[in-house]
């Protein structure tokens, strides 16, 4: 296997057995591809902005003598880059400019004669752009648009499963759901009549819609029924016989023909009878006259002599009618064929309850139902019905909807019109009737073939279209009103509605969410999340059990494990590792094709619908070297069921064992040994891990760590291969390889790293280089680690030495006992950065001012501020300290004579302003690491703002000139090469100053051309530098675009280091979470025979009942990994020769039964082996992929190689007494995470604070600085103890007795510790409530 330079530094031993046929795809492609589709120009006009424009334009005036046509659009360049947008708190977006053409036609001239054409580019608002990592920066914060899983447009057949009515009768229904437009439902009622609803309104008989489509009763019956023909011959009644129709009936008369009796009266007609009738080719049989009574005629019968209607279509025949028909010469009578078994008379019955009889009455009925209370006119009724389903403006099935519609009705073509046709409606009714007749099945709406993914691009396009439609109305008005000769396209378009619609979607849609930025995994998972909630989706309250449950079609598409606990369970899911969406938005998953029993490496992506037709083998089926299945019977999935199939029947095979799960779950080693509930918690808690100060790769991983770290975008990844030319903490410079350069460029790539910035969750984002000078790199290599990554691998926590044993009750109920060593080594120390902002506004009484001159504040409080009133960088501040001094003008108040006197003597200033400074919130402390000042255009900048500006300018200039130097050096080395090869002597050349080199001329014409080209490039480079510097300078010095009424914003960033402490929440990766109960001195911790103490003691009782055995296997394997690291460490310390080291490491990598990983250390240089060994000293990292992990025997082998007991248990001694514990204890290395539930953020105390307005009781919660609720049960407890005075105190002066509590405060001040309880305010509230019910209630003072 070929390793890149970064991977060679530390190779993870892989226990996976199954070959990797398909690499893990780019994990953010669902976001990036979707948005790309939205903004890139699509010549077909199927997707994105292009589709939205084409669907709305051309806009015609009402008179039709002018129209506004769309030509093309382009997106401009964003004003600020992503970082600048985040700092300034603005949206990262690009201006949309659209070329429109106004065409004016001649009025009097014939149709289509053009009078005038004006073309112009019009600004249509800003479109937020996606960053490279799949996020949007909206108002300075990173947000993610979550994909939505919604019901696909199309037609669905369903039933109520017998729940609607007490009789338990199953009522079937059909629903046509368009992408946009009105829903059309058909449903049966108890009496088997068919009804229709439009947009879930009042139901009408279904035949109304057919009449509105201009069908007569005869035509309606013709569409839905087969006919039975009776003929009257020689006063006898003959019936045309179709034998198949008789099956299962009981003969009500002898069936005979040609003198032979086929079925006797009262006998059941069987298949044998039918065969005989068919064999003898019987076409007619004689039936008794009574047989026709009760049959329904299929058309109108008129007496031709008089023109009188004898019987109308859909009338029941009686013997009288039969006689009349016979007399008037109708010898052939057509009736409807119905029976109770599979040809129900539903439509015929429905026609009877239908009150309408022609098209107009049907349209009026529909109009009345849609617009109750409005008087219907013919035109209004017609246009309403036309617009409902047959107008492209109002109704669109979309390509997906049409495809699903046609598939559902078993039609061959999958393309068609976006609106409904007559045939569509009739075919849906026919299929519904077939289902009611017992032919066909209802659909399963939870099947992933019936639910599709709506991603960012599509949702943004819909919002954009909404904005355009609003503009369309305005444009139509303008075209009709204005003087067209002077109008230009830009006078008609108002960009406000468009940008408002887009802004609203990105800013406040339920699916536009504040990005979860705890760590790289939480970012990736958030972008791959799939929600069934949101506009057009489900709501939590209404979603039942079925929607939330795991469906067989989720396999390989949606993760069955990763979903939140709580009310959203099952509604918010995560995309599986290999899943992607197809052109229609349905999820598909890859499979290996199986041809003639041989598994090939050909990969097909199948959607849930396609998958149903195949037999698919599991990824862990055993194959021989040729790719044949070893066993005769293979476990496969087919049609949603798992069972055994013979190997010849298999069509496809899974690509990978981790195909089923999401990225989060695929990072849990030994997932296959964990109970599903705990695996769910494990997958969810990894997302809450806080990045530690020093990331530490997991000793036991799954091999997915690298993919997540690289794809998440938190690391710096090489765009092209080359060598490291320069590296420091904030930038890396790569000299690009010759073969990867574009012609005529300097061949230098510069990577600027992010330093100590704040994430959305207040954790710290910081990148650190992990390459050194002169090192070669390849494209895709990790150059710098971000938060929670270690040498390009995801590293969410720390490897801790754990023991499973009780320890003095300190690990009761999942508590965790931690050694002091963990605190000393800063293993779980995290940095948190908080942003505090102070806004200075323009008030009615005058502007607020940022200043150090604050009334009534002592010197000490101002000691950390500079003369502008802003805190110094580096100041250590605690709760209540002033960060930014600010005063607000105070209204003129009535002054007492004394105050007037004081003001007269001491001047004005002190009392007409009040202190409104920004202070550090209670319970927060830290160091000021950055201050930013934003000043409105036209407001004078203060000293601090100018200092910051100067510093930024200096920094920008320094960065750019360094960049220029690096690029220049690259260019000049190429110029030198050309000159030397052109015959200039190297020594003489080096004596010349570099600027003069370009003046030299070469005789070789080709070389001279090259030189001139390089000279041009040099000029261009300098010009570019000037331009960049000027742009930077303009950006830094220009005023900021602040919200209306805001003059200045000062942002202060506080950083705080948080060590681990009792009350912090920790967890493993298997759902084993707990709270730290005690930090124990190192000397008291249990230790082993070598005197090594354990770091963490966990409760063994947390394992059996929770059934997450994965943590035990992880602990054993971690022990083995560490053991091998210890042996390598010992060899390095003894300075053994490289050959021995190489041999031992090779042995470790080769261990395990037929593993897929082949590491050949003989191809590594000695330096590379030494570097590898150096990185393996702390333990050899191991990958045990999900469902394909290390087996027990392999763990034991590895333990043996590390000279450790194969039981995984060792003897421990008590740190306090030195006595041996009575039995061996499981000790090993587990990867522990510190979760973002820190005691510092939760602990809180109140003495006095704010009170609720109505009840006057203290508020609750830390945010409101609230108190602890003394609830109902606590009151019972005090009652039970008989502690009456304590209880009285709790319910009065400590809660809502307003007078009592002020009195008590005064008493305490006076040193008199008495209390006088009064009436609680909430009792008064109760009195008022009762009075409001009309019951007078008064307290009598006795």
UniProtKB/Swiss-Prot annotation:
InterPro entries: DNA-dir_RNA_pol_bsu_ext_1_sf, DNA-dir_RNA_pol_bsu_external_1, DNA-dir_RNA_pol_su2, DNA-dir_RNAP_su2_dom, DNA-dir_RNAP_su2_hyb_sf, RNA_pol_bsu_bac, RNA_pol_bsu_CS, RNA_pol_bsu_protrusion
Top EC class, one word: transferase
Keyword Membrane: no
Catalytic activity from the UniProt record: RNA(n) + a ribonucleoside 5'-triphosphate = RNA(n+1) + diphosphate
Signal peptide: none
GO CC annotation, single: DNA-directed RNA polymerase complex
GO MF annotation terms: DNA binding; DNA-directed RNA polymerase activity; ribonucleoside binding
Cross-referenced Gene3D superfamilies: 2.40.50.100, 2.40.50.150, 3.90.1100.10, 6.10.140.1670, DNA-directed RNA polymerase, beta subunit, external 1 domain, DNA-directed RNA polymerase, subunit 2, domain 6, RNA polymerase alpha subunit dimerisation domain, RNA polymerase Rpb2, domain 2
Keyword Cell membrane: no
Gene Ontology terms: biological process: DNA-templated transcription
PROSITE patterns: RNA_POL_BETA
A Pfam family: RNA_pol_Rpb2_3
Family of this protein: Belongs to the RNA polymerase beta chain family.
HAMAP family attached to this UniProt entry: RNApol_bact_RpoB (MF_01321)
Name of the molecule in the record: DNA-directed RNA polymerase subunit beta
Species of the source: Salmonella choleraesuis (strain SC-B67)
């Amino acid at each position: 296997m070929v390793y890149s330079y970064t991977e060679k530094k530390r190779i993870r031993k892989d226990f996976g057995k199954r070959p990797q046929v398909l690499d893990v795809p780019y994990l953010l492609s669902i976001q990036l591809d979707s948005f790309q589709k939205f903004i890139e120009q699509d010549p077909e006009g199927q997707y994105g902005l292009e589709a939205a424009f084409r669907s709305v334009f051309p806009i015609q005036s009402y008179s039709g003598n002018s129209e506004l046509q769309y030509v093309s659009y382009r997106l401009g360049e964003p004003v600020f880059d992503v970082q600048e947008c985040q700092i300034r708190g603005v949206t990262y977006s690009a201006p949309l400019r659209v070329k429109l053409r106004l065409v004016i036609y001649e009025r009097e001239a014939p149709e289509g004669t053009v009078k005038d054409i004006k073309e112009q580019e019009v600004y249509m608002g800003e479109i937020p752009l996606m960053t490279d990592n799949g996020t949007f920066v909206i108002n300075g914060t990173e947000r993610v648009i979550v994909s939505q899983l919604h019901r696909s447009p199309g037609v669905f057949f369903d039933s109520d499963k017998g729940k609607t009515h007490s009789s338990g009768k199953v009522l079937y229904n059909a629903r046509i759901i368009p992408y946009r437009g009105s829903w059309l439902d058909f449903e049966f009622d108890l009496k088997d009549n068919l009804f229709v609803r439009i947009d879930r309104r009042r139901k009408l008989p279904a035949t109304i819609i057919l009449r509105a489509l201009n069908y007569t009763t005869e035509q309606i019956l013709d569409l839905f029924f087969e006919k039975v023909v009776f003929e009257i011959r020689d006063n006898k009644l003959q019936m045309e016989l179709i034998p198949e129709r008789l099956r299962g009936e009981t003969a009500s008369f002898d069936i005979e023909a040609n003198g032979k009796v086929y079925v006797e009266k009262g006998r059941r007609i069987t298949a044998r009878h039918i065969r005989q009738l068919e064999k003898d080719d019987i076409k007619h049989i004689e039936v008794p006259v009574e047989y026709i009574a009760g049959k329904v005629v299929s058309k109108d019968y008129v007496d031709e002599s008089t023109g009188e209607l004898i019987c109308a279509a859909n009338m029941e025949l009686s013997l009288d009618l039969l006689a009349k028909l016979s007399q008037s010469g109708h010898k052939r009578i057509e009736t409807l064929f119905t029976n109770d078994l599979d040809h129900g008379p539903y439509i015929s019955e429905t026609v009877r309850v239908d009150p309408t009889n022609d098209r107009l009455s049907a349209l009026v009925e529909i109009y009345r139902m849609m617009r109750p209370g409005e008087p219907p006119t013919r035109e209004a009724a017609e246009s309403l019905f036309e617009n409902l389903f047959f107008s492209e403006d109002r109704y669109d099935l979309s390509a997906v909807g049409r495809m699903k519609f046609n598939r559902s009705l078993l039609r061959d073509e999958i393309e068609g019109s976006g609106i409904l046709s007559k045939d569509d409606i009739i075919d849906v009714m026919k299929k519904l009737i077939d289902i009611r007749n017992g032919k066909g099945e209802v659909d399963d709406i939870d099947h992933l073939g019936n639910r599709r993914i709506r991603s960012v691009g599509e949702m943004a396009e819909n919002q954009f279209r909404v904005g355009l439609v609003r503009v369309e109305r305005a444009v139509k008005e303008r075209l009709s009103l204005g003087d067209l000769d002077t109008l230009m396209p830009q006078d008609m378009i108002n960009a406000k509605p468009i940008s408002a619609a887009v802004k609203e979607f990105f800013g406040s849609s339920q699916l536009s969410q504040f990005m979860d930025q705890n760590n790289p995994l939480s970012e990736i998972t958030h972008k791959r999340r799939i929600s069934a909630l949101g506009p057009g989706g489900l709501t939590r309250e209404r979603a039942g059990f079925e929607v939330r449950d795991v469906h067989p079609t989720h396999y390989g598409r949606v993760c069955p494990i990763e979903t939140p606990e709580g009310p959203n369970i099952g509604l918010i899911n995560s995309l599986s590792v290999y899943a992607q969406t197809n052109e229609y938005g349905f999820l598909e998953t890859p499979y290996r094709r199986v041809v003639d029993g041989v598994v090939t490496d050909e990969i097909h992506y199948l959607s849930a619908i396609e998958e149903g037709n195949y037999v698919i083998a599991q990824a862990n089926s055993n194959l021989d070297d040729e790719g044949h299945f070893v066993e005769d019977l293979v476990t496969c999935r087919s049609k949603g069921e798992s069972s055994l199939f013979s190997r010849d029947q298999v069509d496809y095979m899974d690509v990978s064992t981790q195909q089923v799960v999401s990225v989060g779950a695929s990072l849990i080693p030994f997932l296959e040994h964990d109970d599903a509930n705990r695996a769910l918690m494990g997958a969810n808690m990894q997302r809450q891990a806080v990045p530690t100060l020093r990331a530490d790769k997991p000793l036991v991983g799954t091999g997915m760590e690298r993919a997540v770290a690289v794809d998440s975008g938190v690391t710096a990844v090489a765009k092209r291969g080359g060598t490291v030319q320069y590296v420091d903490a904030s930038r890396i410079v790569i000299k690009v390889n010759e073969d990867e350069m574009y012609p005529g460029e300097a061949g230098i790539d510069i990577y600027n790293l992010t330093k100590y910035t704040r994430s959305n969750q207040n954790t710290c984002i910081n990148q650190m280089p992990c390459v050194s000078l002169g090192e070669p790199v390849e494209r895709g290599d990790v150059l710098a680690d971000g938060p929670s990554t270690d040498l390009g691998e995801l590293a969410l926590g720390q490897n801790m030495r754990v023991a499973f044993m009780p320890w003095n009750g300190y690990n009761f109920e999942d508590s965790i006992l931690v050694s002091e060593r963990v605190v000393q080594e800063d293993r779980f120390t995290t940095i948190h950065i908080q942003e505090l902002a102070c806004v200075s506004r323009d008030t009615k009484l005058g502007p607020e001012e940022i200043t150090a001159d604050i009334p009534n504040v002592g010197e000490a409080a101002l000691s950390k501020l500079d003369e502008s009133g802003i805190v110094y960088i580096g100041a250590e501040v605690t709760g209540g300290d002033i960060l930014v001094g600010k005063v607000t003008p105070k209204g003129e108040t009535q002054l007492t004579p004394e105050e007037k006197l004081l003001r007269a003597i001491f001047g004005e200033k002190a009392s007409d302003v009040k202190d409104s400074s920004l202070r550090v919130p209670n319970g927060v402390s830290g160091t000021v690491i950055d201050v930013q000042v934003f000043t409105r255009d036209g407001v004078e900048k203060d000293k601090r703002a100018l200092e910051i500006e100067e510093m930024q300018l200096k920094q920008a200039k320094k960065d750019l000139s360094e960049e220029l130097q690096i690029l220049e050096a690259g260019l000049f080395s190429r110029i030198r090469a050309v000159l030397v090869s052109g015959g200039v002597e190297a020594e003489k050349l080096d004596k010349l100053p570099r600027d003069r080199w370009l003046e030299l001329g070469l005789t070789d014409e080709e070389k001279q051309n090259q030189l001139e080209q390089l000279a041009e490039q040099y000029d261009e480079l300098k010009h570019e530098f000037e331009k960049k510097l000027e742009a930077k300078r303009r950006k830094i010095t220009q005023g900021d675009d602040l919200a209306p009424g805001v003059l200045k914003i000062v942002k202060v960033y506080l950083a705080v280091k948080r060590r681990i402490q009792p009350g912090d929440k920790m967890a493993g990766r298997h759902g084993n979470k707990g709270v730290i109960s005690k930090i124990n001195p190192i000397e008291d911790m249990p230790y082993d025979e070598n005197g090594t103490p354990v770091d963490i003691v966990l409760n063994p009782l947390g394992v059996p009942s929770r059934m997450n055995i994965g943590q035990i296997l992880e602990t054993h394997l971690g022990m083995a990994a560490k053991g091998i690291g210890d042996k390598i460490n010992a060899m390095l310390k003894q300075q053994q020769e490289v050959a021995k080291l190489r041999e031992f490491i090779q042995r470790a990598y080769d261990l395990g039964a037929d593993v897929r990983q082949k590491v050949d250390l003989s191809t590594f240089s000695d330096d590379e082996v030494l570097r590898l060994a150096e990185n393996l000293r702390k333990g050899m990292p191991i990958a045990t992929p999900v469902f394909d992990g290390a087996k027990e025997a392999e763990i034991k082998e590895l333990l043996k190689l590390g000279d450790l007991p194969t039981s995984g248990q060792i003897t421990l001694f008590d740190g306090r007494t030195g006595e041996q514990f009575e039995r061996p204890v499981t000790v090993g290395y587990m990867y522990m995470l510190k979760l973002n539930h820190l005691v510092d953020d939760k602990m809180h105390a109140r003495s006095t604070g704010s009170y609720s307005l109505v009840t006057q009781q203290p508020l609750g919660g830390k945010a409101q600085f609230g108190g602890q609720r003394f609830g109902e049960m606590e009151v019972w407890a005090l009652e039970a103890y008989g502690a009456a005075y304590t209880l009285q105190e709790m319910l009065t002066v400590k809660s809502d007795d307003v007078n009592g509590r002020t009195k008590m405060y005064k008493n305490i001040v006076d040193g008199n510790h008495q209390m006088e309880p009064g009436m609680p305010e909430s009792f008064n509230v109760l009195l008022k409530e009762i009075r409001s019910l009309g019951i007078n209630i008064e307290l009598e003072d006795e």
